[in-house]
Amino acid sequence: MVAEQGTPKRLHFDFVGAVLWLVRILAILAVVIGAFVSLTSGRLSAAAWLNFVVIGIGQGAIYALIALGYTMVYGVLGFINFAHGEVFMSGAMVGAFAANSLAQAGMWNSSPILSILIVLLIAMATSTLVALLLERVAYRRLRNAPRLIPLITSIGASFFIQYAFLGLFGAQTRTYPALSILDGFISVAGLNIRYADIMVIGAAVVMMVGLYTFVERTKAGRALRAVAEDKEIAALMGVNVNRTIVLTFAVGGAMAGAAALLFGVVFRTVFFFSGFLFGIKAFTAAVLGGIGNIVGAMLGGLTLGIFESVGPSLVLTGLGIPSAHQLKDVVAFLALVLVLIFKPTGLLGERLSEERA
């Protein structure tokens, strides 16, 4: 069959792709212009910028610990547990109650290390228990359901936990008592580092290294990775899939509980809705690092924390936007949008198969 000579070829124009490229270019220009104006204005010293970075690392460490729960559950079960922010909130709320009880008993500042360890164990135990209840009651029967079903269930579970804690603790804000040993800062080459940031960063690093070692070096960790790779083959190899899934929720809950204590010690206030905002930010961190990748969650949390701390002064102020630091939450959510536009797989993520997506 001979093709007709005079038939013109149809040109296909990808309108959505063109818009995305335009958004990419505008975003890069905005960041470059804002950063250039801020850095050349001399408004802040180098030490001030470094202070922003240190504060961002401290915040990012908390995001990273919470993000681990999102990424571990996704890696094993393939769905996003949007109730994980409330797992974090439950540990923070009960931790505040425990911390105030210790303060009334005179232990909080007289024996600060012991008090922190006690509240840490209580917060981790609470968050772990809530995570295990979620797995048992809300998700276990939905393991073979379409991915949309457990996703919707997790949103419902999130609201249920929020209002359960509203009924238990009321709508008022709970405050952690001040910890005298964390007052003040240390000066290093003109850089003022708060003791609270040192504690948060140090504790988070220890826990993240411990988790990485657990996943990579232990038999239970190898089982977890095997189930994440393929449940059926893992079961044929003798791995107890059900127990491994329960362990995944338990570990994610424990990390969220640890983050809850660090959050309480640094920010000091918590209420029944606190888990929503921090949960969304931690989810953003997981996506930024590559959802399903444990190291990616850690890296994503730290990156988001620094971006949220430095971004308003570096970019927004340079663009002439007033009260830039009041927009740090906007910066965090903007980061999620930009990641989804520029690199949907995240920093360390891999392109998903159709089955997992």
Residue ranges and their predicted role:
Residues 13-14, 141-217, 244, 310-329, ...:
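Transmembrane helix-bundle core of multi-pass membrane transporters
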Residues 106-157, 164, 299-304, 308, ...:
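Alpha-helical transmembrane segments within multi-pass membrane transporters and channels
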Residues 1-38, 168, 229-236, 240-243, ...:
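Cytosolic-side transmembrane-helix boundaries in multi-pass membrane proteins
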Residues 59, 192-271, 294-300:
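Helix-loop-helix "hairpin" substructures at the membrane interface of multi-pass membrane proteins
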Residues 63, 69, 116-124, 246-256, ...:
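Transmembrane alpha-helical segments in multi-pass inner-membrane proteins
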Residues 48-99, 133-149, 286-294:
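Single transmembrane alpha-helix segments in multi-pass membrane proteins
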Residues 54, 76-133, 269, 313-321:
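Membrane-embedded helix boundary and interhelical linker motif in transport proteins
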Residues 2-66, 94, 108-118, 145-149, ...:
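Membrane-interfacial amphipathic/re-entrant helices at transmembrane-helix boundaries
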